[in-house]
Structure formats: C-alpha cells, structure tokens
Design a protein with these regions (language model features):
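Phosphate-end processing signature that detects enzymes handling 5′-triphosphorylated RNA
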Residues: 1-200
Length: 200
C-alpha cells in the first residue's frame, strides 16, 4: 500500500530541509531517475471509472507494468515485468496476466491515453538505525494527453511513507506540510500525475 503526500513547487523553489522532519536522522544522497510511463484505458474509460490506472513504465527500480487502485487508505499497486519493448509508434499489447488482473472491471481493447516522462531525483529519509522513514522525490514532469493532443509541464514533490514510518502518519504529514510551506511549496491540487495530464 502506498501512502503518500503530493506537493506542487515552482521551478526555482528550493527543497525543504527534511532533516527537520520528526524521526528523520539522515537525508540520503540524491538518486537521479529518468522515468517514461505510458498509460492505457478502454475506449469508454472503464479503468478511470473504477479509480484504477494501468501503465507500462521504464526507468527506476520498479520499472514494469503497474496496476494502481485508489483506496481510502492509499494506493494499492500490483507489478509485473516489462516484457517486450514497444517503440514510440507501436501499439502497446497488455500482457495476459495484467489483463486478467483487470478482468472484473475492464476488458480489451486497451488504448494508450497518456504518456508521462519524469526527470526524478529521489532522497531516502532514514532514522537513527538506518531504516527508511520515507522517500522524498523531486519530479519535473512532461505529460501528453494523447486524446486531446495537449502537453503540459510541471514540478511536483512526493513524500511516500517507508517501513519505519510511524503507525499514525498524521503528525509526520502535518510536519511535512509545514516544511513544504516554509520552503515555498504547496499541497498539490491534483491526486495523480495521470489525472493532471488529462486535465482533471
């Protein structure tokens, strides 16, 4: 289960001082990742109606096929290997196991609806024992809505809880909000990159 907070930031906004976050003893070195995600749905938007996103993403430690379901407690993600490469102009074929996972809410054909490229810098926020409290990522996003032919760019931050996060994350997120606001950022108006890419 992914439990995270998203923020918006201007291009020149400096990063928050995450060493001031309760429970964080060390901010790790920056790790750069180039991510390229291609999102699919049915022609009638069955996945969106079920609050589910389907993507094929390259780059980063978790590249592959992802199905993300939005739940009250956070986002539940299921992953599969990438499989054969798909060129920019080639239709993407959804692997059988992925389609089977979605069978209760959507049936083929699936078509590409958005492409999101993301230049990401990630930082591990660890406690005094070296356990991961949270991961902070600084994302510079270029997104294309393939149905409307619209491209948008923005910068956003995400703070995702790790295994060493407190059982009640509310105080941690409240402290994170304060650090972000002090740095010049703001709580995101959009719940997901895909939603923002599609103008939601």
């Amino acid at each position: 289960m992914e439990v995270e907070r998203k923020y918006d930031a201007d291009d020149a906004t400096a990063l928050p001082d995450w060493s001031a976050l309760p429970g964080v003893a060390r901010v790790g070195a920056p790790e750069h990742r180039e991510l390229d995600a291609r999102y699919l749905d049915t022609p009638d938007g069955a996945l969106a109606s079920a609050l589910t996103a389907l993507r094929r993403r390259t780059g980063g430690p978790d590249e592959g096929w992802h199905v993300k379901r939005s739940l009250a407690a956070g986002k539940h993600e299921t992953r599969w290997p990438l499989g054969p490469a798909a060129g920019d102009d080639e239709a993407i074929e959804v692997p059988g196991p992925v389609a089977a996972e979605l069978a209760e809410i959507a049936s083929p054909p699936f078509a590409e609806i958005a492409r999101i490229r993301n230049s990401r810098t990630a930082y591990a926020l660890t406690d005094a024992q070296g356990a991961l409290v949270a991961e902070f990522v600084d994302d510079r996003v270029t997104a294309a809505d393939l149905r409307r032919g619209v491209e948008t760019r923005w910068r956003e931050w995400e703070l995702e809880l790790g295994p060493a996060a407190p059982a009640d994350p509310a105080p941690l997120f409240a402290a994170a909000d304060a650090l972000v606001l002090a740095a010049g950022g703001r709580v995101s108006a959009s719940g997901s990159k895909l939603g923002r890419a599609l103008g939601h």
